[in-house]
Amino acid sequence: MRLAIFGASGATGRHLLQLSLDAGHTVTVLLRSADSVSIRHPALTAVVGQFDQLATVASVVQGADAVISVLGARKGGAQTICSDAMRSIMLAMQAKGVRRLIALSAYGAAESRDASWFIRFVRMVIADRMRDKDAMEALVHSSGTDWTLVRPPALTNGEASGRYRSGTGLRPGITARLPRADLAAFILHTAESGAFIGQAPVVFT
């Protein structure tokens, strides 16, 4: 497959990028600087640019079988990165005729905001980030693409377990966690299999 990945330099993105290349896929990524990722591979094309450069974003998605966004707000960084970037990604996909879109959201976004008292509390603590996820999900729903929104609970840097649960009717508890390595594996499998189109699966261990 030809994959376009946004957020490849992040904690989840690095796992996803390595897994994608190991699986034999051709990958194009958008980076703020050329040294944002240390991976070098003949099947990897790194494009340097910003999300407000629509022609650059379009060059990343051109010819892609699937576009994957694993963007997330960083401490001290822009708290609207997910929704701002998604606007550019959607315009680029429309311009290049690319339909498959997988975007990393969060359990507790959109209609899952009232899943439990704990989720409501989390939304209060990280209100700006969750509003960004809400806005991104609304954009994706209106995109006209073959979309999937992935909703993990709290993420960890633990090793991949390969034993995660996923589905649209799941309600993870307070202690639910997910290693970023497992999240990356789930996202790649979703891209490869074409599963969960038009759905927002929850995934956790």
List each model region and its residues:
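Substrate-positioning beta->alpha
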Residues: 81-82, 132, 150, 178-188
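N-terminal Rossmann-fold cofactor-binding loop
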Residues: 30-35, 50-51
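NAD(P)-cofactor binding segment of oxidoreductase domains
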Residues: 74-101, 131-135
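SDR active-site strand-loop-helix element
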Residues: 6, 30, 68-71, 101-107, ...
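Conserved Rossmann-fold cofactor-binding substructure of NAD(P)-dependent oxidoreductases
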Residues: 45-65
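N-terminal Rossmann NAD(P)H-binding glycine-rich loop of SDR-like oxidoreductase domains
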Residues: 3-23
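Conserved beta-loop-beta element that borders a ligand/cofactor-binding pocket
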Residues: 137-159
